[in-house]
Amino acid sequence: MFRVLFLMLTLLVGLVAGPYISGQQGYVRIETANRIIEMSITTLVIFFIISLAIIYAFEWGVTRFFRLSRSSYQWFSNRKRVKAQKQTLEGLVKMDEGDYAKAEKLIGKNAKHSAEPVLNLIKAAEAAQQRGDEFSANRYLIEATELAGSDNLLVEIARTRILLQQNKLPAARSSVDSLLEMARRNKEVLKLAVEIYLRSKAYQALDKILDNVANSGLFNDEEFKDLRSKTENGLLDEKMNEEGIDGLLTWWNQQPRHRRNNIELKISLIQRLIDCNDHESATELTFEILKKLGDNTAISLPLCTQITRLQPEDNSKLLKLIEKRAKRVDEKQKCCINRALGYLYVRNNEFIKAADVFKNVIACPEQLEQNDLMMASYVFEQAGDKALAEQVRQESLKSVMAIQDVIPESAEEKTEENSTALLESKSE
């Protein structure tokens, strides 16, 4: 606009000043080696104005051309972006429908032209993995890494998840370790870490992140309690298998107080000690639990079960403690505590006392365990009450036969139903 105004003003000045200098304008002489050019000043001014007009027109044409090129480029780019967005949405729908091959094609085809190319490549990798194409999944992840960088949290989470789906536990373990260094409190990272550590039985690593898992809110109280129990029991097995009983007990004594005071975990430790024939240590821990529980706290069924397995050289202290509790036990605990007491009497060959407590055990038919009747008949026989032993043995056989009769009856009912259905289909 300014240039056009400049040209118009120049022409206007020429038109106004022309008559005043008419006849006095003189001339201009331009001399070169081979040529001489002479013209009036007016002609020179007109030539200068025309030259400027040509230059300005050329500049305008070039600018216009480049503007058209940029507009064309933007138009094609917008078209590709809109197409990529449309294909991404269609691909996500196909992914939800389970058509992973179509989803991968739609999401990954124009991924680089989408609004978030890294997300598209990650989703394409997940779709490829779902249909079992590990090569394509890894290729998409490599492209996503090139775009986002090697330390991108989103890409690394997707890589770890896909490694887990490929069942490459060592690689997934290494990847999740790196993720925990990048984002230790990230919920998705913690969720992956829990799953990978459980599947790879890396209980020590899982134990280190339990506090963060508890604070993350990933699990409710019951689920987290179950996770902690699995972790701690896994640690017991790990230490027992790697370092033996001595290493297990040394590790146990080094644990924090809240863990050593965990009754359920201590019962699990007793079970492992008995499995390894360390009945003395198991008896000592059992005695500690009973002393800590006191007289008014009920004994759990798992603890009673482990007491029946104990075979220490001297069980007198434990026996006195359980005898004291058995005198004031309620009906719910009657069967459990008498069973434990009876087995301790049997270990000491005190069959008369064992017979008395086993009478209390078989008086609770709803709480009987599989071997209770067999053990009771053995005790009664050793105590000299052969009639009662035979009666209990007959009841045991009847219960076994009753259980065996239930299975054929259910099988016959199914056979009759199938045959009836077959006859109906033939009649049709």
From Swiss-Prot:
Q: Which UniProt keywords apply?
A: Cell inner membrane, Cell membrane, Membrane, Porphyrin biosynthesis, Transmembrane, Transmembrane helix
Function text? Involved in a late step of protoheme IX synthesis.
List the record's Gene Ontology CC terms alphabetically.
plasma membrane
Q: What topology in the membrane does the UniProt record assign? A: Multi-pass membrane protein
Q: Does the keyword Membrane apply?
A: yes
Membrane-spanning intervals of the chain: 4-24, 36-56
Predominant cellular place of this UniProt entry's protein: membrane
Q: What residue spans carry the region label Disordered?
A: 408-428
Annotated localization:
Cell inner membrane
Which pathway does it take part in? Porphyrin-containing compound metabolism; protoheme biosynthesis
Short name of any one Pfam family annotated for the protein: HemY_N
Q: Which gene holds the coding sequence for this protein?
A: hemY
> Which classification does the entry list for the species?
Bacteria, Pseudomonadati, Pseudomonadota, Gammaproteobacteria, Pasteurellales
Official protein name in the record = Protein HemY homolog
Name one process (GO BP) from the record.
Answer: heme metabolic process
